[in-house]
From Swiss-Prot:
It comes from Rickettsia canadensis (strain McKiel). Consists of 3 domains; the N-terminus binds the ribosome, the middle domain has PPIase activity, while the C-terminus has intrinsic chaperone activity on its own. Its EC number is 5.2.1.8. PROSITE patterns: FKBP_PPIASE. This is Trigger factor. Keywords: Cell cycle, Cell division, Chaperone, Cytoplasm, Isomerase, Rotamase. InterPro entries: PPIase_dom_sf, PPIase_FKBP_dom, Trig_fac, Trigger_fac_C, Trigger_fac_C_sf, Trigger_fac_ribosome-bd_bac, Trigger_fac_ribosome-bd_sf, Trigger_fact/SurA_dom_sf. GO terms for cellular component: cytoplasm. Signal peptide: none annotated. It is an enzyme of class 5 (isomerase). PANTHER family: TRIGGER FACTOR CHAPERONE AND PEPTIDYL-PROLYL CIS/TRANS ISOMERASE, TRIGGER FACTOR-LIKE PROTEIN TIG, CHLOROPLASTIC.
């Protein structure tokens, strides 16, 4: 057996390996002899089948198995001998596997870079902190009171803000109907902003039995991309109009929502308002940390990981073409290259950090990720939980996200300096919106 190192620089290791024909033949002869003792072939007694017959029938498959084992053996030998920290599967090229010649092949191996973890204690970040004001809580109470109103009194006068209207509607774009444009017995409270912007306002002043045209424009960020930004006309039938009595917000109101009194419900809402902002804050904090890390990392990364990440990026941007619609092909290529490099470097660093701190994933880490995903599907949470409960492989696919979240949280708690920065609800909403726009392409 001979090993010739062809390349050992950067993250690439290439070697040419050869095994004498005599070794292959020896293995072949041994396995053929073993098989003659076990194989059953018509016309021969058990254990008395000639080697030549066994070779004719099974020789090719036996030789292929031997070659595969030999290749695996010598590749593993090279990896151990040169102490290679490999990534992915070694590539076998230039395979010479002729029956009358020595086995020869070239193995190409990608190596993980040596990663030096930077001094994370030198990193400092602002941590947004929401200051919940009494007016924020009162707004939530008012919304709850509005949502739980009982609309029992039918109105015979014209529609006004706050009325509940039952409608049928058919939507048209350029005088043609479209999928999802038909509404039947839809109940909507005027002013709730449940429908497309401008829709509800145009119903004001109409009466039960009226038929009116409502002209709207679908928002640019509308979830149905084929409708986003388009003008539409809805022919609306007003089927019924109902009003409600004002809801008194007091202790009795609070008891309807598992609170002993109004003050307890206020406390609950204050905590809920604070918690609702935490997930968005954590996402932005993570991206801000990654911004800092990106400037500290300059190691080379394996080409295979880079290409894999570029493909993921392409699939992400293909789902939302608006992300790169104003960029040239050169700018798009540069974007993919830069962002893929950032993601791979940070991913490798976090994995190395987890190893250095012996951070292990536990069931609760996966549970947190699943809960986060379920929040993206309001009303379908149980379906998401059931999906992961019944699909262990799907849970395994969350491993990368779960580890990233765990490591980032550990770094926040034990490494970097966090300076609390207080925001009002309005200030925080503006900050989060601006930051979310910035990190959309990260």
């Amino acid at each position: 057996m001979g090993i010739t190192v062809l390349k050992n620089e950067g993250l690439d290791f290439h070697a040419k390996i050869s095994t004498p024909l005599s070794e292959i033949d020896d293995d072949m002869q041994k396995e053929l002899l073993d098989l003659t003792k076990k194989v059953k072939i018509a016309g021969f007694r058990a254990g008395k089948v000639p080697v030549s017959i066994v070779k004719k029938k099974y020789g090719t498959s036996i030789r292929n198995d031997i070659i595969e084992r030999r290749i695996n053996h010598w590749v593993n030998h090279v990896i151990k001998e040169h102490n290679l920290n490999i990534i992915g599967r070694p590539k076998i090229e230039e395979l010479q596997n002729e029956p009358d010649k020595a086995l020869e092949f070239t193995v190409k191996i990608e190596i993980l870079p040596k990663i030096t973890i930077p001094d994370l204690k030198k990193i400092s970040l602002d941590r947004p902190k929401l200051e919940v004001k009494p007016k924020d809580v009162e707004e939530q109470l008012e919304k709850l009171a509005t949502l739980t109103k009982s609309y029992t009194k039918e109105s015979k006068v014209t529609i006004k803000d706050g009325d509940q209207v039952t409608i049928d509607a058919i939507g048209y774009i350029k005088d043609k109907t479209f999928d999802g444009g038909k509404l039947n017995d839809l109940k909507v409270v005027i002013g709730s902003n449940t429908l497309i912007p401008g829709f509800e306002k145009q119903l004001i002043g109409s009466k039960t039995g009226s038929e009116i045209d409502v002209n709207v424009t679908f928002p640019e960020n509308y979830h149905a991309k084929d409708l986003a930004g388009k003008d539409a006309r809805f022919v609306v039938q007003i089927k019924a109009v109902h009003t409600s009595e004002p809801t008194l917000i007091d202790d009795e109101f609070a008891k309807k929502f598992q609170s002993n009194n109004l003050e307890e419900l206020r406390t609950h809402f204050a905590k809920q308002i604070e918690n609702e902002s935490e997930e968005a804050i954590n996402t932005i904090m993570k991206m801000n940390l990654f911004d800092k890390l990106e400037k500290l990392l300059d190691f080379d990364v394996p080409e295979s990981l880079l290409e894999q990440e570029k493909n993921i990026l392409k699939s992400e941007t293909d789902k939302d073409e608006s992300l790169l619609k104003d960029k040239s092909s050169k700018e798009i290529t540069e974007y993919y290259n830069k962002l893929a490099l950032r993601r791979v470097r940070i991913g490798l660093l976090l994995a190395e950090y987890a190893k250095s701190k012996n951070l292990q994933l536990e069931p609760d880490d996966f549970k947190k990720v699943i809960i986060q995903q379920a929040r993206n599907f309001p009303g379908q949470e149980n379906m998401i939980f059931d999906f992961y409960k019944n699909n262990p492989k799907a849970i395994e696919a969350l491993k990368g996200t779960a580890l990233e979240d765990k490591v980032v949280q550990y770094i926040f708690n034990n490494e970097i300096k966090l300076k609390e920065k207080k925001y009002t609800k309005e200030e925080l909403e503006k900050y989060l919106e601006e930051e979310e726009q910035r990190i959309t392409l990260i």
